[in-house]
UniProtKB/Swiss-Prot annotation:
Taxonomic placement: Bacteria, Pseudomonadati, Acidobacteriota, Terriglobia, Terriglobales
Protein name: Protein-glutamate methylesterase/protein-glutamine glutaminase 1
Enzymatic reactions: [protein]-L-glutamate 5-O-methyl ester + H2O = L-glutamyl-[protein] + methanol + H(+); L-glutaminyl-[protein] + H2O = L-glutamyl-[protein] + NH4(+)
Cross-referenced SUPFAM superfamilies: CheY-like, Methylesterase CheB, C-terminal domain
Compartment list: Cytoplasm
Record-annotated CheB-type methylesterase domain positions: 155-348
SMART domains per UniProt: REC
Active site (UniProt): 167, 194, 290
HAMAP family documented for this protein: CheB_chemtxs
Record's function text: Involved in chemotaxis. Part of a chemotaxis signal transduction system that modulates chemotaxis in response to various stimuli. Catalyzes the demethylation of specific methylglutamate residues introduced into the chemoreceptors (methyl-accepting chemotaxis proteins or MCP) by CheR. Also mediates the irreversible deamidation of specific glutamine residues to glutamic acid.
Length: 355
């Protein structure tokens, strides 16, 4: 068996020891080496040729962001998983790491002593992410017969809402898609990105600086407005409900689905109920299959589904399940998704004007 080789970069002796302990228990993973700071790690890359790097954000001499910036000059495709804290500073730094090319991140709990629950929390995050990133996770679901073959180049029902779901690689994908939506975009956009509390707020703030239409983390019982983007809050599901002649956004802490809260499936089911055939759903890069069942529900309601292609996905898990099941009417590179959203919404707006 060819084991996946991991280079651990962390200034903490305790964390380095814990990661060694975690990886030693996985038959398909091995520690290629350890480094206490970025300078040492960069010197070790040629010698060790790791398959993936775990990189702490806060380190002396050369921190994780500086290390990542240098690493990406020579190794643009090497998977890098950042280690961050559940703090405002950690959230901001993690989003900056994504802009520099980080593949994913793991949050360090306050309790990470040997034998503590923190160790299992790190294991539960880290091991699946290493496997997904290094094996370019392919969905196990076999292709299913195409049941939804409606040609929506000229859709019969105008698009009245856009719902987007993403996970691993999502922040960068969203930064490539959402800024394409122009000022005056006529429908609301709802986004689920798998992230913990605080991280989602800073993600929304970053996207708001990049986009032509306002972006904000969703608030409880918020009235849906066209031409706005709302991001689900970490540790809360986001749903859309009818309210008289309009719609309302809700936050809830119902049970996780697909081990996720917020979950894409929860959002997709709610928009299918609220908007029916007027939904345009987009499933982008991410591990696992969150969004698959919700995409089925949207297609059964007459809505439209687009999936990101494998070549531009960091992990082709979520969009791959949707594409392989024949649920996606189009499978597109991330660079084309924003324009496709605008095209389909514009067709519907033109239909309404001509009605």
């Amino acid at each position: 068996m060819n084991r996946t080789r991991v280079l651990i970069v962390d200034d903490s002796v305790v964390i380095r020891s814990l990661l060694r302990q975690i990886l030693a228990q996985e038959a398909d993973l091995e520690v290629a080496g350890v480094a206490a700071n970025g300078h040492i790690a960069l010197r070790m890359l040629d010698q060790l040729a790791p398959d993936v790097v775990t990189l702490d954000i806060e380190m002396p001499e050369m921190n994780g962001l500086e290390t990542l910036r240098e690493l990406r000059r020579t190794r643009p495709r090497l998977p890098v998983i950042m280690f961050s804290t559940l703090t405002e500073r950690g959230a901001v730094a993690t989003l900056e790491a994504f802009s520099l090319g980080a593949s994913d991140y793991v949050t360090k709990p306050s309790n990470s002593r040997p034998g503590g629950q923190g160790v299992e929390a790190i294991r539960a995050q880290l091991v699946p992410k290493i496997r997904a990133l290094c094996r370019k996770e392919r969905p196990a679901l076999p292709p299913l017969p195409q049941k939804f073959n409606r040609d929506t180049s000229f859709p019969g029902v105008p698009i009245t809402a856009v719902a987007i779901g993403t996970s691993t690689g999502g922040p960068n994908a969203l930064s490539q898609v959402l800024p394409r939506l122009p000022k005056g975009f006529p429908v609301p956009v709802f986004v689920v990105q798998h992230m913990p509390p605080m991280f989602t707020r800073f993600l929304a703030e970053r996207l708001n600086r990049e986009c032509a239409i306002p972006v904000r983390e969703v608030e409880e019982q918020e009235v849906v407005q066209p031409g706005t983007i709302r991001v689900a809050a970490g540790d809360h599901h986001m749903t859309v409900e009818r309210m008289g002649l309009g719609f309302q956004l809700r936050r809830s802490q119902g049970p996780p689905e697909n081990s996720c809260r917020p979950a894409v499936d929860v959002l997709f089911r709610s928009v299918a109920r609220a908007y029916g055939a007027g939904v345009l759903a987009v499933v982008m890069t991410g591990m696992g299959q969150d969004g698959f069942r919700g995409a089925q529900t949207i297609r059964e309601a007459g809505g439209t589904v687009i999936a990101q292609d494998e070549a531009t996905s960091v992990v082709w898990g979520m969009p791959g399940y949707v594409a392989n099941a024949g649920l996606a009417e189009r499978v597109l590179p991330v660079t084309e998704i924003g324009n496709e959203i605008v095209r389909r919404v514009s067709l519907g707006a033109a239909m309404r004007r001509g009605a």
